[in-house]
């Protein structure tokens, strides 16, 4: 029997849905560190790469224990960032989002922080020392 169009669409929509729910996300003993708002070159592809990495991570079954945003990457955690909902989702999964206060101060963005914990250098070093793997973007 050939499935009708409704059944086919249901399968396709279900198959491509996001695979992670808060209850099933597991924390790996790792830390991801973002220092820029792009990966590689500062062009459309580089900016899309950061977006793609964070969105894919938010749909993964295993997420890092920490994600650190420092230098210009703190801009991803402030008001009007296109990635706020994605980073919020990761935080709800239990990922500890650390945002460098020094960078926010230098960029005059401290009052615009909307996701994550304001962190000092001691917090950042402590997080790095708690994990087995640090991934730097």
Q: What are the functions of these language-model segments?
A:
Residues 83-109:
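A glycine-rich helix N-cap at a beta->alpha junction
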Residues 17-80:
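Conserved mixed alpha/beta catalytic, RNA-binding, or beta-rich assembly cores of soluble enzyme
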Residues 1-16, 26:
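Helix-enriched interaction subdomains in cytosolic or periplasmic regions
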Residues 114-130, 135-136:
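C-terminal structural segments of small proteins and small subunits
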Residues 28, 64, 94, 131-132:
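Short, well-ordered alpha-helix to beta-strand connector turns
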Residues 75-80, 106-113:
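Glycine-rich, charge-decorated loop segments at or immediately adjacent to ligand/cofactor-binding or catalytic sites
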Residues 69, 99-100, 135-137:
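General beta-strand structural signal in soluble alpha/beta enzymes
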Residues 54, 84-88, 125:
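Short amphipathic alpha-helical segments and helix-helix/interface helices
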């Amino acid at each position: 029997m050939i499935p009708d169009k409704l059944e086919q669409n249901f399968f396709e929509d279900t198959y491509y849905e996001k695979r992670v729910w808060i209850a099933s996300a597991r924390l790996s003993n790792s830390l991801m560190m973002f220092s820029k708002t792009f990966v590689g070159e500062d062009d459309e592809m580089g900016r899309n790469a950061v977006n793609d990495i964070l969105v894919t991570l938010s749909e993964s079954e295993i997420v890092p224990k920490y994600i650190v945003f420092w230098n210009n990457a703190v801009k991803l955690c402030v008001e009007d960032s296109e990635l706020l909902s994605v980073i919020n989702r990761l935080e709800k999964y239990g990922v500890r989002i650390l945002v460098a206060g020094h960078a926010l101060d230098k960029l005059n963005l401290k009052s615009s922080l909307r996701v994550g914990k304001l962190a000092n250098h001691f917090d950042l070093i402590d997080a790095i020392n708690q994990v087995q793997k640090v991934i730097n973007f």
